[in-house]
From Swiss-Prot:
It is found in: Cell membrane; Membrane, Clathrin-coated pit; Golgi apparatus; Early endosome. This is Low-density lipoprotein receptor. The keyword Transmembrane helix applies. SMART domains: EGF, EGF_CA, LDLa, LY. GO terms for biological process: cholesterol homeostasis; cholesterol metabolic process; receptor-mediated endocytosis involved in cholesterol transport; transcytosis. It is linked to Defects in LDLR are the cause of familial hypercholesterolemia (FH). The NPXY motif mediates the interaction with the clathrin adapter DAB2 and with LDLRAP1 which are involved in receptor internalization. A few residues outside the motif also play a role in the interaction.
Length: 811
């Protein structure tokens, strides 16, 4: 668009409420009234006449400034198989009279009869019903734990599974509700157990006379009260403080002799300061701005004594005289997605698939409806962001904890802590138990975190008891332990298959957030400070930022993917009493809270606008957002090569894209096997020198659990063999059994003769070198005639790393 003064601006900037043309022609009434919306858009009308997608019309959220997009909308109607709450929301009929308030107004539990359970069910003391098989199995399923009460389970005592009375380590406290927490969190004034048992029977803290007692009972040094910094967790040390500092503000003047007087007493021909500094003869009545604006580049403001330089909005003073443009885009939260810096201002733009909302200036998704999927212990539920649809997706589960989806294939994956398995099914077939596929069914202890690589069709999971991070293909046929560290407690995990990285939280000692390649290499700690109990973690791919919740600090924080620009989004001991997981979409952050038994949302940039999404849940843990824009397309280099599976005999894993020269993928072998010299084939760990374990192997600080590959392994020559056959081939690489013992009598004499010949040759060569004069240099660099070079060689389908070579200093 060409402004009337000749300047050109982007056409999408006209009539957006901000003036880009200096003459204002981009926001003039004539310009805006001439705008016509394209087919599929809705015109807000009015003076601005902005266009929004038709799908935003009557969606319950005002997008036009004049609210025209929500005018004349008919009331939302629920389908025949849904229950309509009094507030107009729709929920699944199974949620009605289930003893849980699923309508925010509670209308689904009004006038409900006393529930009765079927013959194959057990009725909890709270009147809810659970399958009879879940009662007295050593795992509490009723909200009040009554299914495991001794009076109900005497007849089942012999059939109970063996369980440790205290599964926690010596450095942990065992909550009565079953969790393990750090022993240092016991009686610290902050509830960490679900049942608050960590704060029971605690001695009341008494502070010394020189200390201040916070409202939560903790003590801080008395000098920290009213020091303008929050030292108490409940911020009570800064309440009721009078932080008035003398001579601050535009109406105060500080004399050079120390007094503070009112500004109206300056230059009034009366001495108010002892040193007469309020009545300087040369400066009173002088306007320095009349002479070349006092040297100011933009605005000169005359004062009673002296003058000051000011800058227009969007500029900052750099040397008391000169103004410089402020780059607002240095703030990662200036815009929700793309920030364009302009002279004196900035513009926000959106990624493909999003459109800037006229009213809030936030990027809003276009197209399909976004859903929240979340676990509720015995089921997975599905809910739209406006709660207009709220249903049960996967019912009758034992103890579902972790969750993730693959949007393109319309599949959902989840882990069950009680079953110690990872499952998957098609979302449209989720209610059918017969459609569940067991992806990982063995060698799991506590699969707390789960993430799907939607580009390379792999799943990654954490195990907090084994202290491992593992990978498998989405069918569960091939798997490998990528990382294991003693004392670690990995929890949640998120992947970035576009760039080849994964991130996970670890609440072991010390707590941290780790980053590594999706092939297990280059693992390091990204966050190690101001972190205590990191739980859920999620990734904003478009913005390149990580978000996580800390259950001990009651906070939501963010950081860029390289560990910089850390920000605290929200701290709230009430709404973040015990946050477990979180999800990001558009400008919103959604999180589950175990103690509140609820799901909340807030603005992910400011932490404001907190809303209750769902309540009265039963241990809500993981939460994911289902929308096609959350999983952008990428290149699967393992399938782009001429060789099947990238030429890898077992797993082909994406490599981290650290720089433009980084490999696209590397091969990996199952636990207990190593890569051969070709960096594609797999050999047993007993293979002698001649094989090499290069950087494409995993980074593990301890040996992971060994898994038997139940799948067939495909070689580069497309030869298929079983795991047992693969071991036989590796064994034959170590030694071949001779056909007859008599061959030894022929081979050994020949070998001895060859050794005798080479020995004689080396003795002669040594004598010859000693008889020749040599030149010695003090600088040791001259003693090395052959340079050590390490090259990363690129083949047709990937990258390989050469084996190490010894360089002689004499040769």
């Amino acid at each position: 668009f060409q402004c009337q003064d000749g300047k050109c601006i982007s056409y999408k900037w006209i009539c957006d409420g901000n003036t880009e043309c200096k003459d204002g022609s981009d926001e003039s009434l004539e310009t805006c009234m001439s705008v016509t919306c394209k087919i599929g858009d809705f015109s807000c009308g009015g003076r601005v006449n902005r266009c929004i997608p038709e799908s935003w019309r009557c969606d319950g959220q005002q997008d036009c400034e004049n609210g025209s997009d929500e005018e004349g909308c008919s009331p939302k109607t629920c389908s025949q198989d849904e229950f309509r709450c009094q507030d107009g929301k729709c929920i699944a009929p199974k949620f009605v009279c289930d003893s849980d308030r699923d309508c925010l107004d509670g209308s689904d539990e009004a006038s409900c009869p006393t529930p009765t359970c079927g013959p194959a069910s057990f009725q909890c003391n709270s009147s809810t019903c659970i399958p009879e098989l879940w009662a007295c199995d050593g795992d509490p399923d009723c909200e009040d734990g009554s299914d495991e009460w001794p009076q109900h389970c005497r007849s089942h005592s012999s059939s109970l599974p063996e369980r440790s009375n205290n599964p926690c380590s010596a450095l942990e406290f065992h909550c009565h509700s079953g969790e393990c927490i750090h022993s240092s969190w016991r009686c610290d004034g902050d509830t960490d157990c679900k049942d608050k048992s960590d704060e029971e029977n605690c001695d009341v803290a008494t502070c010394r006379p020189d200390e201040f007692q916070c409202s939560d009972g903790t003590c801080i040094h008395g000098s920290r009260q009213c020091d303008r910094e929050y030292d108490c967790k409940d911020m009570s040390d800064e309440q009721g403080c009078v932080n008035a500092t003398l001579c601050e503000g535009p109406n105060k003047f500080k004399c050079q002799s120390g007094e503070c007087i009112s500004l109206d007493k300056v230059c009034n021909s009366v001495r108010d300061c002892r040193d007469w500094s309020d009545e300087p003869l040369k400066e009173c009545g002088t306007n320095e701005c009349l002479d070349n604006k006092g040297g100011c580049s933009h605005i000169c403001n005359d004062l009673k004594i002296g003058y000051e330089c000011l800058c227009p909005e969007g500029f900052q003073l750099v040397d008391k005289h000169r103004c410089e443009d402020i780059d607002e885009c240095q703030d990662p939260d200036a815009c929700s997605q793309i920030c364009v810096n302009l002279e004196g201002s900035y513009k926000c733009q959106c990624e493909e698939g999003f459109q800037l909302e006229p009213l809030t200036k936030a990027c809003k998704a276009i197209g399909t409806i976004a859903y929240l999927f979340f676990t509720n212990r015995h089921e997975v539920r599905k809910m739209t962001l406006d709660r207009s649809e709220y249903t049960s997706l996967i019912p009758n589960l034992k103890n579902v904890v972790a969750l993730d989806t693959e949007v393109a294939s319309n599949r959902i994956y989840w882990s069950d802590l009680s079953q110690r398995k990872i499952y998957s099914t098609q979302i449209d077939r989720a209610p059918s138990f017969s459609s569940y596929d067991t992806i990982i069914g063995e060698d799991l202890q506590a699969p707390d975190g789960l993430a799907v690589d939607w580009i390379h069709s792999n799943i990654y999971w954490t195990d907090s008891i084994l202290g491992t991070v593992s990978v498998a293909d989405t069918k569960g046929v091939k798997r490998k332990t990528l990382f294991q560290e003693k004392g670690s407690k990995p929890r949640a995990i998120v992947v970035d298959p576009v760039h080849g990285f994964m991130y996970w939280t670890d609440w072991g000692t010390p707590a941290k957030i780790k980053k590594g390649g999706l092939n297990g290499v280059d693992v390091y700690s990204l966050v190690t400070e101001d972190i205590q109990w990191p739980n859920g973690i999620t990734l904003d791919l478009s913005g390149g930022r990580l978000y996580w919740v800390d259950s001990k600090l009651h906070s939501i924080s963010s950081i860029d993917v390289n560990g910089g620009n850390r920000k605290t989004v929200l701290e709230d001991k009430t709404k973040l009493a015990h946050p477990f997981s979180l999800a990001i979409f558009e400008d919103k952050v959604f999180w589950t809270d175990i103690i509140n038994e609820a799901i909340f949302s807030a603005n992910r940039l400011t932490g404001s606008d907190i809303h209750l999404m769902a309540e009265n849940l039963l241990s809500p843990e993981d939460i994911v957002l289902f929308h096609n824009l959350t999983q952008p397309r990428g290149v699967n280099w393992c399938e782009r090569t001429a060789l099947q599976n990238g030429g890898c005999q077992y797993l082909c894993l994406p490599a981290p894209q650290i720089n433009p020269r980084s490999p696209k993928f590397t091969c990996a072998c199952p636990d207990g096997m190593l890569l051969a010299k070709d960096m594609r084939s797999c050999l047993t760990e007993t293979e002698p020198a001649g094989t090499t374990q290069g950087p494409s192997m995993v980074n593990s600080t301890a040996v992971g659990p060994k898994h038997t590959a139940s799948s067939e392994l495909t070689t580069a020559e497309s030869v298929t063999m079983s795991q047992h056959a693969l071991g036989d081939v590796a064994g034959r690489g170590v030694t071949e059994k001779p056909q007859s013992v008599g061959a030894l009598y022929i081979v050994l004499p020949i070998a001895l003769l060859i050794l005798l010949f080479f020995g004689t040759f080396l003795l002669w060569k040594n004598w010859r070198l000693k008889s020749i004069n040599s030149i010695n240099f003090d600088n040791p660099v001259y003693q090395k005639t052959t340079e050590d070079e390490v090259h990363i060689c690129r083949s047709q389908d990937g990258y390989t790393y050469p084996s190490r070579q010894m360089v002689s200093l004499e040769d």
